[in-house]
Curated annotation (Swiss-Prot):
Low complexity composition bias: residue spans: 289-307
Species whose genome carries this gene: Gloeobacter violaceus (strain ATCC 29082 / PCC 7421)
Domain of life: Bacteria
PROSITE patterns, per the entry: G_TR_2, IF2
The protein's name: Translation initiation factor IF-2
Length: 925
């Protein structure tokens, strides 16, 4: 056993030797199976080798290539007239040898139009003289096997047959009982062609072993379809005894048609001798002229070039033409690659059916170093695919949950009106939460750290109307720039957006962003101009600024409702609610089916110390009950309890009701869909599948983040090891975790790289302390607490735990910490300058008599001597004297003598620059 076998690998030529096959046979099967290889010396895995062995056991005869070749040459004359249809070869499949004839396994087809079969007499032809070579082959035992009967199973054809084809099929119905002589020659009878655009052929099924009692299938001697059918059919002349035909050259192998890879069936058809049962295909008659090779009829489905010969001429002609036809077929079908995200180099190579070395080489030429197991992001994978001639298309991603997608076809008959979902959006500190508090008569804003909202709150209120109380659902989103994802999530599930703009501040960046989110979600916008009670309020200026973003007030001829309000004074709140109900009634059609299993979206999620994972869910269709089996993204759970926005326990949540859900096995991601299932086993299976896919995507992203370009690698090698700051993030809710990670990724990381080891909702535990101690990481605790014993463990292990309540303070500290990891840089600090007025010889050297023009000169400081534009010396001030006395420094406006041990070529007019090198703290910018 070779070393490759011992390592779980085997070379192709070793496998071919074990199977008794030619290397080209095995390579052809490798290509058919999609196994990457280059030569017969390439190695494949043991699993791939088993697939090849299984294919050969189902396919090629055990005698190898030589025996198959003798059988095919001997049976060529008997099988010539039976090839009524030649199928196209599959894309990428290369036949092993020109003279091998792949046998087609098809079954007879019952015509779609039943007609009364009329038996036709078979013409009796005289015996032809057989050449010696053919006679020897006919005497071989393999030829005797070729004439044994084969059972044929009829299959109903899905192809429609028009009236013109029925006449051609009549003579083929009842001729299976007619005998055929082995010496019978090809009868080139006229036939009608089938439709060019035929649907895919049915899968071939292996034929049973020949039985002595099985009836002998007989086919009429019909030729293949002509290359150029003509409207005037004429029977082709047959060879006679006086004009013996020359021995025919074996025909090129007829390959099975290309099929999708997922379809079953044998990869290699068994190479049986004898007559092959074929499906009768009507062909259009055309005049044929017998040639020396007798292959003047173009194959059905083949693509021929203008002026191509009929098969005669130098050897290799049919092989060459077949290769041209296969190349033409390949060119016809564009190579399309579907990508849905990050992908490893090995998976990309398997999808494109190219060696992995080709992808590695392509990226190397673009200064990107990767290995076979490395993950490429989607942009890089698309670049490689286009370089290799593939057209990249994005796989249809599963759409995220929206209010319209929650409705199914079966809900139409049971739809009822549901309350509208209103999202409060706007710039930070413009009074969004205060306005909602005034509507709810609550004080949520007082509990927010720093006075800014840092997570989504969902609330339900009742509005008294003349027809009775009506419900409104409010979502309060953060206005800080770090919480972009939360605002986008709020706009995604909302029906109406209330844009809060401060009358004394006007339109700000987060106001513009909120407008963009609302327009992208396609929801109507209602503007609440807040703080109109302040002295410097200017509502008209706010309206003017909003017109720049296509929000024109109704009183100016537009369609946007703008209501001046005051959250503190509770001014015009009833008018705001009234307009919300008007927009919901006249512009929207809000319906849901409460009599079905619930579906919806997770608005927020957190880990509670006493209650476990808690998710704030918005039911968008159906009714959520206690005890329901629920799947949230990749998390399975059973609803243990439901709480409304005021903390009251409820048994069910109808559509558009926000509730807190208890009973999940883990903290879900904010924005995930949830759905209730009746079968617990099915729910667990779906959750497990999503978990596996999420884990794979997470690993791919981690691998993609470690990819290093050649330029960056060289720079890091010159400057030393790249600095890295490891972090562990813990926050109160999942949305805050997302916001922190997104904000950290925006920090410059060219000099110091951030590596987030863990990021999740929940308190800081002792496990986090152990991980931080082992990896020298810093723990960031955002609006959460430390578990019992965690603080003491952190002090003992020396782990830095930073606690924050406001996100921008966290970002400032992290940036300072990243800058602290940078080595200080040396910068030049200018001290002064002097001009050489006169040169004095002193001993063996010279001293420059100077006049200090600016700053001061210091002894032992560094100096630079300039003569014109050229620097003639750079060194230290070794001696500094004033009136023959040593001086430590000489200030501006005084004369002095300057000397250096390493420079004596002073000249009047030289300029002296005195400076020193100092260290300076580096910044990320």
């Amino acid at each position: 056993m070779t070393n490759a076998n011992m390592q779980g690998k085997i070379r192709i030529y070793d496998l071919a030797r074990d199977l008794g096959r030619d290397n080209r046979d095995v390579m052809a099967v490798c290509q058919r199976l999609g196994i990457a290889h280059k030569t017969h010396s390439s190695t494949i895995s043991e699993q791939e080798a088993d697939s090849i062995r299984e294919a050969f056991q189902r396919g090629l005869p055990p005698g190898g290539r030589k025996k198959a070749k003798i059988q095919q040459q001997g049976a060529a004359a008997a099988n010539k007239q039976q090839i009524l249809e030649v199928r196209r070869p599959p894309v990428g499949y290369q036949p092993p040898v020109r003279t091998e004839v792949s046998q087609i396994l098809v079954s007879t087809v019952t015509p779609a139009v039943p007609t009364e079969a009329q038996p036709l007499p078979i013409p009796t032809l005289p015996e032809l003289p057989v050449p010696e070579q053919v006679a020897e082959q006919a005497a071989a035992p393999s030829v005797q096997e070729a004439v044994e009967p084969i059972a044929v199973s009829p299959v109903t054809s899905p192809l429609p047959i028009d009236a013109a084809d029925v006449e051609a099929d009549n003579y083929t119905a009842d001729e299976d009982s007619m005998p055929i002589s082995i010496a019978q020659t090809v009868v080139e009878a006229p036939a009608a062609p089938t439709s060019e655009a035929a649907p895919p052929e049915p899968e071939p099924t292996p034929l049973p072993a020949p039985a002595a009692e099985a009836p002998q299938p007989v086919r009429p001697p019909a030729p293949p379809a002509p290359a150029k059918p003509t409207p005037a059919p004429a029977p082709a002349p047959r060879p006679t005894a006086e004009q013996p035909s020359e021995p025919r050259r074996p025909q090129p192998p007829a390959q099975p048609p290309s099929r999708p890879e997922k379809r079953g069936g044998p990869l290699i058809a068994p190479n049986r001798g004898g007559l092959q049962p074929t499906r009768p295909v009507p062909a259009q008659p055309a005049p044929q002229t017998p040639t020396r090779s007798g292959s003047g009829i173009a194959k059905k489905g083949a693509i021929t070039k203008a002026g191509s010969g009929s098969g005669g001429g130098r050897p290799g002609g049919p092989m060459r033409r077949r290769d041209e036809r296969e190349a033409a077929v390949v060119d016809e079908q564009p190579k399309i690659l579907l990508l849905s995200g990050n992908i490893s180099v090995q998976d990309l190579a398997q999808r494109m059916h190219v060696p992995t070395t080709e992808i590695i080489k392509t990226l190397f030429m673009k200064s990107v170093m990767v290995n076979i197991n490395q993950t490429l992001d989607q942009a890089t994978a698309e670049l490689v695919a286009r370089e290799l001639g593939y057209e990249v298309q994005a796989e249809t991603a599963v759409a995220q949950a929206t209010k319209t997608e929650m409705l199914d076809v079966g809900d139409i008959e049971s739809l009822e009106v549901r309350p509208p979902v209103v999202t409060i959006m706007g710039h930070v500190d413009h009074g969004k939460t205060s306005l909602l508090d005034a509507i709810r008569s609550a004080r949520v804003a007082e509990g927010e750290a720093g006075g800014i909202t840092q997570h989504i709150g969902a609330y339900q209120i009742e509005v008294p109307t003349e027809a009775g109380p009506r419900k409104l659902v409010f979502l309060d989103t953060p206005g800080h720039e770090a919480f972009t994802a939360m605002r986008a999530r709020g706009a995604k599930v909302t029906d109406i957006t209330v844009l809060v703009v401060a009358a004394d501040d006007g339109v700000k960046p987060q106001t513009i962003e909120a407008i963009s989110h609302a327009k992208a979600a396609g929801v109507p916008i209602l503007v609440a101009i807040n703080k109109v009670d302040k002295p410097d309020a200017n509502p008209e200026r706010v309206k003017q600024e909003l017109t720049e973003y296509d929000l024109v007030p109704e009183e100016w001829g537009g369609k946007t409702v703008m209501v001046p309000v005051s959250a503190k004074q509770k001014l015009n709140l009833d008018l705001l609610l009234e307009n919300l109900l008007l927009v919901a009634d006249y512009e929207l059609e809000l319906m849901a089916n409460p009599n079905r299993q619930a579906k919806g979206t997770i608005i927020e999620a957190n880990l509670d110390k006493a209650r476990g994972p808690v998710a704030t869910a918005l039911v968008q269709n159906g009714t959520l009950h206690v005890g329901d089996i629920i799947v949230v993204g990749s998390i399975f759970g059973k609803v243990r309890a439901l709480y409304d926005d005021r903390g009251n326990r409820v048994d069910a949540a109808p559509p558009s009701m926000p509730v807190e859900v208890l009973g999940l096995t883990d903290v879900p991601q904010a924005g995930d869909e949830f759905e209730v299932y009746s079968d617990e086993r099915e729910a667990r299976r779906i959750a497990d599948e999503r978990t596996s896919k999420a884990r794979e995507n997470r690993l791919q992203q981690q691998m993609a983040s470690r990819r290093v370009s050649l330029g960056a690698f060289s720079a890091q090698a010159q400057e030393g090891e790249l600095k890295e700051l490891a972090l562990i993030i813990r926050a109160d809710v999942q949305g805050s975790v997302e916001a922190i990670r997104a904000s950290l990724e925006k920090l410059p990381q060219d000099k110091v790289q951030l590596r987030v080891l863990q990021a999740a909702a929940g308190e800081v535990s002792e496990t986090d302390i152990d991980l931080a101690a082992a990896s020298n990481a810093v723990i960031l605790s955002f609006s959460t607490t430390l578990a019992s014993g965690a603080r003491q463990a952190a002090e003992q292990a020396g782990v830095d735990v930073r606690e924050y309540d406001v996100i921008y303070k966290l970002l400032e500290d992290i940036q300072l910490a990243m800058e602290g990891l940078l080595d200080p840089e040396l910068v030049e600090e200018a001290l002064g300058g002097a001009e050489v007025r006169q040169v004095f010889p002193v001993g063996k050297g010279q001293v420059a008599g100077c006049y200090v023009k600016e700053g001061k000169l210091l002894r032992n400081a560094q100096m630079r001597v300039r003569r014109g534009k050229e620097v003639v010396f750079e060194g230290h001030v070794d001696s500094l004297k004033r009136f023959k006395e040593d001086a430590k420094e000489v200030a501006t406006g005084f004369e002095c003598g300057v000397g250096s041990d390493k420079f004596a070529s002073w000249q009047p007019g030289d300029l002296i620059e005195c400076f020193r090198m100092v260290t300076q703290k580096r910044t990320l910018n």
